[in-house]
Amino acid sequence: MSDNRLDTARHHSLFLARQLDNGKLKPEIFLPMLDKVLTEADFQAFADWDKIRAEENEEELARQLRELRRYVVSQIIVRDINRISDLNEVTRTITLFADFAVNTALDFAYAYYRDMYGTPIGRYTKSPQHLSVVAMGKAGGYELNVSSDIDLIFVYPESGDTDGRRERGNQEFFTKVGQKLIALLNDITADGQVFRVDMRLRPDGDSGALVLSETALEQYLITQGREWERYAWCKGRVVTPYPNGIKSLVRPFVFRKYLDYSAYEAMRKLHRQISSEVSKKGMADNIKLGAGGIREVEFIAQIFQMIRGGQMRALQLKGTQETLKKLAETGIMPSENVETLLAAYRFLRDVEHRLQYWDDQQTQTLPTSPEQRQLLAESMGFDSYSAFSDGLNIHRNKVNQLFNEILSEPEEQTQDNSEWQWAWQEKPDEEERLGRLKEYGFDAETIATRLDQIRNGHKYRHLSAHAQPRFDAIVPLFVQAAAEQNNPTDTLMRLLDFLENISRRSAYLAFLNEHPQTLAQLAQIMGQSSWVAAYLNKYPILLDELISAQLLDTAFDWQALAAALSDDLKACGGDTEAQMDTLRRFQHAQVFRLAVQDLAGLWTVESLSDQLSALADTILAAALLCAWADMPKKHRDTPQFAIVGYGKLGGKELGYASDLDLVYLYDDPHPDAGDVYSRLARRLTNWLSTATGAGSLYETDLRLRPNGDAGFLAHSIAAFEKYQRENAWTWEHQSLTRARFICGTPEIQTAFDRIRTEILTAERDQTALSGEIIEMREKMFPTHPPADSNVKYARGGVVDVEFIVQYLILAHARQYPQLLDNYGNIALLNIAADCGLIDKTLAGQSRTAYRFYRRQQHNTKLRDAKKTEVTGELLAHYGNVRKLWREVFGEEAATA
C-alpha cells in the first residue's frame, strides 16, 4: 500500500505499522477512508449488521466490530499525524464509533434474549422496555481517546417481566443483555478488542447491580449519591435512541437548585486524592493526572458547572471545551484565561493521543527512551525533545497556576479554648492544637486538617440552629474518646466521618448528646474495625442498638427472634416496601450486635458463623412467606416450595459479607407449577437482593442449581433428582456435600435429604474420583495462583482442606454414613479420623490449620488485618495439610 501519508504516520505508530505489514488493512477499503471524516454511515456500511443479527452470529459480530475498530483507529492515526484532522475530529470520530459499537452490540444482545425470553414489558405502562446505555466520562463528553476504555451505566425504564414462554424479570433480562453487550465489546479474541468496558461508575460500583431501573437510579442518587458521583454524572450521556427519563432524574442530583459552593471542597478533596496517588506512584510525567495536566483543566470547567449549573442551564454541557467557551461567554471566567486553558487542553490531548498511537496502549506517561522522545517531539511539530518539553511545561505551569487560584485551600483560622474544647474551635491556636494532638498520640496534621475540613465544609455550615450546638458538643468528646484507643488517628477519622455523615439527621446528633456513655463504646468499636465503622455509616439507625440491654448478650434465641420478626412483618399490613424494610432493619441489627460481640472477643469464628447462618435461615424463612403472600395468581395458600443452602450457608461458615448460594425446589403437580414457582424464585431473590431505603440484605448466587445459569430458577424435586443421578458433574456432587435444607415444605426436606444421602453414598471408583478432584484443583491455578499469602487458594490452604473432606465423603460415606452429617469441615475431619480413613495426627493438625485460616480470613475483614503475613506458623499449617492431601490423594495437583 503506497501513500506518503502512511509512511509518515507509521514512523510514529508501531500499531499502524503492524496493521500495514500484516495485511490487516485492505487498500480498497482503507485508502478512501483517509480522505474523509468518518461518520456513522461509514460504520453502518462496513458490514451487513442486520444479517449478522438476524442469523444470531455472535462470533461474526465480534469479529466485524474488532476489524472495524482496526480501520477506524488506523484512519484516525494517519489523519492526525499528518495534521489533516484536529483534536475535535479525533475525539468525535472515536466517540461516534464507540456509540455505534455499543448500539450494535446492544441490538444484537437484546434481540438474542428477546427471542429466548420474549419482550420485556413494563409493570405499570404495559409497554415494551428497552435498555438505555449511559456513557460516562470522556465517552459522555465526545472526548474519547483512541485507546480509552468506555465507562457505561445500564438503565431500564421500569420493573416487570418478559412476555415469552420462558418468562424472566426485567432485571434479569436486562442483566443478561448487559453482560452480553460487555462481552461483545470487552472480550479479547484473536481479532483483538473493541473497547475495554468499565462499569464501576454505576451505583454501588462493582458490588452494585449491573443494571437498574430508573426508579432505582433515582432512589440511589437521592439517598446515597456522593459528591464524586455528581462530578461523574455531569458528563453522563444516553447513547441509545430509546425513550427514557434519565436526564430529568439525574439533573437535580448533579445541578443543585442553589449555588453549591460545597463543590469547591468536594473537588479539592478529589484532586488531593488524585495528587496523592500521583505523588505516591511517581507520576509527575503523567500529562493527565500530574500538576497542570488534563484533569486540572477538566476540574476547572466542572467546578463552575457544579456550583452554578443548577441556576444556569447553559452550563449543563458535556464537553470540556464547550464548557470553557461558555464560561467565557457568560463572563464567569475571563476570556484570556479560557483561551489559555483551551490552548493547553488541545496541546495536552494531542500529546496524549500520540502516546497512545505508538502501541495502542492507554497511557498518559511521557516516554523515557531518547528515540521515542524524539519521535514524540517531531509528531508535535518540534525539532527536539528539549524544545517540546519546554513548550509542554509552559502549558502545564499556566494550567496549574489557574487551578491553584480557583481551587486554593481556605485560610486556616486560629484561636484557643480550654480542656478538650481546644480541639474544636472556630479559630484554634494551631500550635497548641497540634502539640496536644501529638501528646495524645494523634497524627496531628492529619486530624487538624480533617477538623478544619469539617468546620469549613458545607454540611457543618448549613446545620440548623438546633443541630450545630449538638454537633459542637460531640466533636471534643469524640477526640477524647479516640485518644483512649490504640489507634487514635484512625479511630477519630472514622468517628468524624460518621459524625459528618449523620449531621443532617438532628435526631442522631440528639442521640449522642443524650447518651454520652455510648461515645466511648462507639470509639472502641470504630477503632477496632473499619468494616463496622462503614456498616454504621451505612445504617446509622443502628446507634440505637448501643443502648440495648441485649447488645452484649450472646444468648440468641432464634425461635423467639423469628416470632418477633413475624409479628413486625404482620404489622406492616401487606405493605411490600415496609416489609422489605423491616427484614433489613432486623438483619442489620443482628449483624451489628454480633459484630460488637465479636470485637469484644465473645465468639470463636466457628460459633459466630453458626449465628450468622442461623440469622440467614431466619431471614430466608420470613422472606419466603412474604414473597409468596405478595405473589399474584397463585393456585394454593401454602407453596410447595423449599430453599436449599449450598456453600458457606450450607456448611454454616457464613461471614459478615458472604453471599448466599441458593437452590430452589418445588413438589407440586399443578400444570402451572413450573411457571408459578419460577416467578416465586425470582420474586424471592429480589426480596433478598434489592436495595430499599433501609438498605440491602444479601447478595444471592443461584449458579449451583441444575444446569447453572442456563437452568430454570426453580426445579421440581423430581427434576433435581434426575439431574443429580444422570447429569451432575463430580464438582456438583462435591457441592452437594455442603448442601442443607433451609426452609419450606417438610415433604421436600424429606425428599431432598433422601436424594442427598443416596447420591453421596453411591458407589464410586475411588481412583477416578481422586483424579477428577485433583483435576478440579488444577483448574483453579490459572485464575487463583496458590500464593502462600492467600490462605484460601495456597497449597495446603482452605480449598485443599475442603476438597479433602469432600473426597472423603464421596468416597466413603457409603461405608461410613456418619460422614453425611453436615457438621462442618473441622468436625468431619475428626469423624474421618475416627473411621480410620485418615491419620489422626494429620487430621488434628489439619483441623488446627483450618481454624487458623478461618481466623485469618475473618480478621482481614473485621479487624483491619493486613494481607496475610507468611510466617513460619502459616507455612507449618500448609505443610501439615499438604501431608494429609498426599495421604488421601497420593499426589498433589499440578500447576501446569
Curated annotation (Swiss-Prot):
GO molecular function: [glutamate-ammonia-ligase] adenylyltransferase activity; [glutamine synthetase]-adenylyl-L-tyrosine phosphorylase activity; ATP binding; magnesium ion binding
Region (Adenylyl transferase): 417-896
Superkingdom of source: Bacteria
Segments for region (Adenylyl removase): 1-411
Catalytic activity: [glutamine synthetase]-O(4)-(5'-adenylyl)-L-tyrosine + phosphate = [glutamine synthetase]-L-tyrosine + ADP; [glutamine synthetase]-L-tyrosine + ATP = [glutamine synthetase]-O(4)-(5'-adenylyl)-L-tyrosine + diphosphate
UniProt-listed CDD domains: NT_GlnE_GlnD_like
Record-stated family: Belongs to the GlnE family.
Purpose of the protein: Involved in the regulation of glutamine synthetase GlnA, a key enzyme in the process to assimilate ammonia. When cellular nitrogen levels are high, the C-terminal adenylyl transferase (AT) inactivates GlnA by covalent transfer of an adenylyl group from ATP to specific tyrosine residue of GlnA, thus reducing its activity. Conversely, when nitrogen levels are low, the N-terminal adenylyl removase (AR) activates GlnA by removing the adenylyl group by phosphorolysis, increasing its activity.
Protein name, as recorded: Bifunctional glutamine synthetase adenylyltransferase/adenylyl-removing enzyme
